[in-house]
From Swiss-Prot:
HAMAP family: Thr_tRNA_synth. Keywords: Aminoacyl-tRNA synthetase, ATP-binding, Cytoplasm, Ligase, Metal-binding, Nucleotide-binding, Protein biosynthesis, RNA-binding, tRNA-binding, Zinc. Its main location: cytoplasm. Its EC number is 6.1.1.3. GO terms for biological process: threonyl-tRNA aminoacylation. This is Threonine--tRNA ligase. InterPro entries: aa-tRNA-synt_IIb, aa-tRNA-synth_II, aa-tRNA-synth_II/BPL/LPL, Anticodon-bd, Anticodon-bd_dom_sf, Beta-grasp_dom_sf, TGS, TGS-like. The gene is thrS. It comes from Clostridium novyi (strain NT).
Length: 637
C-alpha cells in the first residue's frame, strides 16, 4: 500500500499501481466524472498516469485553471486534426491553451474564411464524437526529427532541432493524428463536450516579425454547452463594451497608424485621466507619499547598473545624445532610486515613500498591440518605499489596504497571486527567501487568500499581483507589490541606523493602476462608457426646447460651472427627443431639459441616465445632489 496525500491534507491508503483516474474514483464518483487532469507532487499529470509511491495528489477539474488549460490544450489538438483531415497540405506550427481558450497557428496557402471555419468546426465535433483516446509516446531527438520530416512538418522539425541532442521528445496520438507535444491532455476527445471557433488573426512564426506570417485560429472549449453559451453571450456583450469602439464614439481616446501603440487622448479623455490622477495624488498624499518626477531619458550606464540591460534590453528603446548612449526608461525605479540616493538618510526618516506618475516606453511586437490594453508607451503609477527589514510587514499591509480601498471604489472584486523567483533572476537564495517570506507574512496578516504563481516574479524580487474581476467576469492584472533586496545593493543605498552605522534599506516597488492607459481601457469596458458622475467627462448636458430658453440655459450653465460641475450646452435647432437620444448615446449622467415652463417657474426638468425622468427640481437641490455624488464618488454600476 502507498499513501496519497490530497490537497486538503487527507491521506488515502491505496494499492500501488493505480491510475490517477482510479484514485479519483476512490475519493468520489462525482470527482472522477469531473476530473480532467492532476498534479502529482506539484507536477502536472494526466488521469491515466500511474502512481507507485507515496505522493501528494491534486485532482484538477474545470473549476481549476489548470483543468481548463488541459481540456483546451486537447481542443487545440482536435482543431489541428480537423484541419489536417480537411486540408492535408497545411503545415502545423504551435497550438497552446490560453486564457479563456486556445489557438493553433497554421501555414496555409489559402485564407481561413468564416465558411472554412464553419467546416472545420463541424469536423472537430465529429472528432469529439469519435471518442479518440489520446496516447503519449516518445522518441529520441534524431528519430523525432526524421518522424516530423516524413510528415513534412517543417515547423515541428525546427522546434525539435532547437532542443538539446540528449532530449527525449514526446508526442500525442489520437486516431490518425499525431502532434509534437509535452502535454498534459484529457484521456479522450469526448471530454471536450462544447467547442467553438471564434476568429482568425495573423501571427508571425515564433513572434518574430522577420519570420513568415502564419494564420492563427482562436477557439474556446467547455465541459458543458450551457457554459459555452454563457461565454459566447459574454463575448457579444464585450464587443459592445470594446474600449477601442467606445473611446472613439465618446471622444475619449484613439490609436492611429501614425503612432502604433502610442495612444492619443482627446479633451474628454484627458478630463477622465486627470480626474483619476488627481484622486491618486489625493490618496497618496494622505498616505504619506511624496510625489516625484524623473527624466524619461537616462544614460545607458544606469540601466547596466540596475540590471535592466541584462534582463530587459530587448524591451527597451535607445537613442544617442552628444555621442553617448541613452535609454528611454521602461520602468521608473532607477530614477526613484537616484532621488533617494541624493541625500543622506537616518533610520528616523524611514519609511520613505516616493510616488511617480511616470511615462515609460516598452517595445511590443505590432501583433501584440491591443487598444489601451497593450501599448508601447504608458504612464505607470509607480511608488517606491525605502524601509528597514522590521518595517516590511506593516508597510506591505498599508499598501494592501490602499489597493483594496482603491479597487472597491470602482466596484471591482479581485484575487491575489504571489509570484516567486523566475529562472532569469539576480540575487542570493537567502535574499529571495527573505523577500518571499516577507510578502507571505503580510498577506497572511491581511487575511487575503492567494495563489502561488511559481517562477513569475520580477528578475529582482518576488511580487504580489492583484487581478481585477470586471462586471463581465473577466480578469485583469493591475496592481503589483514587489519586494526588492537587489536594487539597494546594486546602487549601494544606505541609511544611518540607531548605532550610527550605515545599513542597507529594503525597497518595495508597487503600482495600483498598473498603467493608467490600461486602467482607463478596463474602466471604459467595465462601465460600458457610462462612467460614475465623479468620473464622467461631461456630468450634465443642458438642452433647450426653443430659442426662447437660450439665455436661461446659459444662466443654469454658469451656476453649475461655479459649483465645479462639468457641463455642456446643446442649443442646436433640433427636436428635443433627438437631443435627449444623443445625450444618452454619449452616456451623460444628467440631462436638463428647459422649456418655457421651467424658465417661467425658475426650475429645471431633470433626466438621469439610469433612472430616466426625475421631473422638475429646484436648481439648488439639483446642484447639492450632484455635488454629493461627486464628493462621495458614488459608483453607479
Amino acid at each position: 500500500m502507498i499513501k496519497i496525500t490530497l490537497k486538503d491534507g487527507k491521506v488515502l491508503e491505496v494499492e500501488k499501481g493505480l491510475t490517477v483516474s482510479e484514485i479519483a474514483a476512490r475519493i468520489s464518483t462525482s470527482l472522477r466524472k469531473k476530473a480532467l487532469g492532476a498534479k502529482i507532487n506539484g507536477e502536472k499529470a494526466e488521469l491515466m498516469d500511474v502512481i507507485n509511491e507515496d505522493s501528494t495528489l491534486e485532482i484538477l477539474t474545470f473549476e481549476d485553471q489548470e483543468g481548463k488549460d488541459t481540456l483546451r490544450h486537447t481542443a487545440s489538438h482536435i482543431l489541428a486534426q480537423a484541419v489536417k483531415r480537411l486540408y492535408p497540405e497545411v503545415k502545423l506550427a504551435i497550438g497552446p491553451s490560453i486564457e479563456n481558450g486556445f489557438y493553433y497557428d497554421f501555414d496555409a496557402e489559402f485564407s481561413f474564411t468564416p465558411e472554412i471555419l464553419e467546416k472545420i468546426e463541424k469536423e472537430m465535433n465529429k472528432i469529439v464524437k469519435e471518442n479518440l483516446q489520446l496516447k503519449k509516446f516518445t522518441k529520441s531527438r534524431e528519430d523525432a526529427i526524421n518522424f516530423m520530416k516524413e510528415r513534412n512538418e517543417d515547423y515541428k522539425v525546427e522546434l525539435i532541432e532547437d532542443l538539446p541532442e540528449e532530449s527525449i521528445i514526446s508526442f500525442y496520438e489520437q486516431g490518425d493524428f499525431v502532434d509534437l507535444c509535452a502535454g498534459p491532455h484529457v484521456p479522450s476527445t469526448k471530454e471536450v463536450k462544447a467547442i467553438k471557433l471564434l476568429s482568425v488573426a495573423g501571427a508571425y512564426w515564433r513572434g518574430n516579425e522577420n519570420n513568415k506570417m502564419l494564420q492563427r485560429i482562436y477557439g474556446t472549449a467547455f465541459t458543458k454547452k450551457a457554459e459555452l453559451e454563457e461565454y459566447l453571450h459574454m463575448l457579444e456583450e464585450a464587443k459592445k463594451r470594446d474600449h477601442r469602439k467606445l473611446g472613439k464614439e465618446l471622444g475619449l481616446f484613439d490609436l492611429k497608424e501614425e503612432g502604433p501603440g502610442f495612444p492619443f487622448f482627446y479633451p474628454k479623455g484627458m478630463i477622465l485621466r486627470n480626474t483619476l490622477e488627481n484622486y491618486w495624488r489625493e490618496m497618496h498624499e494622505k498616505a504619506g507619499y511624496g510625489e516625484i518626477r524623473t527624466p524619461i531619458i537616462l544614460n545607458e550606464k544606469l540601466w547596466h547598473q540596475s540590471g535592466h540591460w541584462d534582463h530587459y534590453k530587448e524591451n527597451m528603446y535607445f537613442t544617442k545624445i552628444d555621442g553617448e548612449d541613452y535609454a528611454i526608461k521602461p520602468m521608473n525605479c532607477p530614477g526613484s532610486i537616484l532621488v533617494y540616493k541624493s541625500d543622506l538618510h537616518s533610520y528616523r526618516e524611514l519609511p520613505i515613500r516616493l510616488g511617480e506618475l511616470g511615462l515609460v516606453h516598452r517595445h511590443e511586437y505590432s501583433g501584440a498591440l491591443h487598444g489601451l490594453m497593450r501599448v508601447r508607451n504608458f504612464t505607470q503609477d509607480d511608488a517606491h518605499i525605502f524601509m528597514t527589514k522590521e518595517q516590511i510587514t506593516s508597510e506591505i499591509l498599508g499598501v494592501i489596504k490602499m489597493i483594496d480601498n482603491f479597487y472597491s471604489l470602482f466596484g471591482f472584486e479581485y484575487f491575489v497571486e504571489l509570484s516567486t523567483r523566475p529562472e532569469d533572476s539576480m540575487g542570493s537564495d537567502e535574499d529571495w527567501e527573505a523577500a518571499t517570506n516577507g510578502l507571505i507574512k503580510a498577506l497572511n496578516e491581511a487575511g487575503l487568500e492567494y495563489k502561488i504563481n511559481e517562477g513569475d516574479g520580477a528578475f529582482y524580487g518576488p511580487k504580489i499581483d492583484f487581478h481585477l474581476r470586471d462586471c463581465l467576469g473577466r480578469t485583469w492584472q493591475c496592481g503589483t507589490i514587489q519586494l526588492d533586496f537587489q536594487m539597494p545593493e546594486r546602487f549601494d543605498l544606505s541609511y544611518v541606523g540607531a548605532d550610527g552605522e550605515k545599513h542597507r534599506p529594503v525597497m518595495a516597488h508597487r503600482v495600483i493602476f498598473g498603467s493608467i492607459e490600461r486602467f482607463i481601457g478596463i474602466l471604459t469596458e467595465h462601465y460600458a462608457g457610462a462612467f460614475p458622475t465623479w468620473l464622467a467627462p461631461v456630468q450634465v448636458k443642458i438642452m433647450n426646447i426653443t430659442d426662447n430658453q437660450v439665455e436661461y440655459c446659459k444662466e443654469i450653465q454658469k451656476v453649475l460651472n461655479e459649483n465645479g460641475i462639468r457641463v455642456e450646452l446643446d442649443l442646436r435647432n433640433e427636436k428635443i427627443g433627438y437631443k435627449i437620444r444623443e445625450a444618452q448615446l454619449q452616456k451623460i449622467p444628467y440631462m436638463l431639459v428647459l422649456g418655457d415652463k421651467e424658465m417661467n417657474e425658475k426650475t429645471i426638468a431633470v433626466r438621469a441616465r439610469k433612472q430616466g425622468d426625475l421631473g422638475a427640481m429646484n436648481l439648488t437641490d439639483f446642484v447639492a445632489m450632484v455635488k454629493k455624488e461627486i464628493e462621495e464618488k458614488t459608483n453607479c454600476l
